[in-house]
Amino acid sequence: LQKLPREAGKLIVTDGVFSMSGDVCLLPEITELARQYNAAVMVDDAHGFGVLGRGGRGTADHFGLTDKTDIIMGTFSKSLASIGGFMAADQYVIDYVRHNSRPFIFSASIPPASAATALAALRVIKAHPELVERLRSLSDYMRAGLARRGVEIKASTTPIIPFYTYDM
């Protein structure tokens, strides 16, 4: 970033929650870096959407940085039990991706039943935000149960619970 001209287009891309470790990205530091170097920020929130933030709104919301995150993308296949995904960004970014992304151009639309499933799941999460907290509570319960049984687990604040199998 330091070597690029300030006016050059730059994009910092990160996972919101890393799928193998359950670690949450350092979004405050990333957005500050983006501010320093005039870069945009993109968060792939496949594992943060439905889990972190107010009512499961995701990693950017978790940190209060939704307004400093230029592109948020996620999947319906994890917390919404469907297929497909989403991208939230300024309209010109969405139009660019829609017209220039080969995988998007050559793929089929989400089936109506899958869209309805995702929408129904979103409505449940919105009506019952306590379910997100329950997921966190159940994750903590699982961690404690594994630890009591001597299973070595990696520290994580998300429902992703990495554990070591060694020679089991």
Specify the residue positions occupied by each region the protein language model found:
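Active-site phosphate-binding strand-loop segment of PLP-dependent enzymes
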Residues: 1-43
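Short beta-strand
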Residues: 10, 73, 107-108, 151-157
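Short, small-residue-enriched loops and turns at beta-alpha junctions
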Residues: 17-21, 48-51, 104-105, 162-163
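Active-site PLP attachment segment
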Residues: 61-96
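A short glycine-threonine-serine/GTX helix/turn-capping micro-motif
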Residues: 83, 101-110
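Structural motif of enzymes handling amino- and sulfur-group chemistry
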Residues: 109-128, 134, 138-143, 147-148
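Conserved PLP-binding catalytic core of the aspartate aminotransferase-like
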Residues: 133-140, 147-168
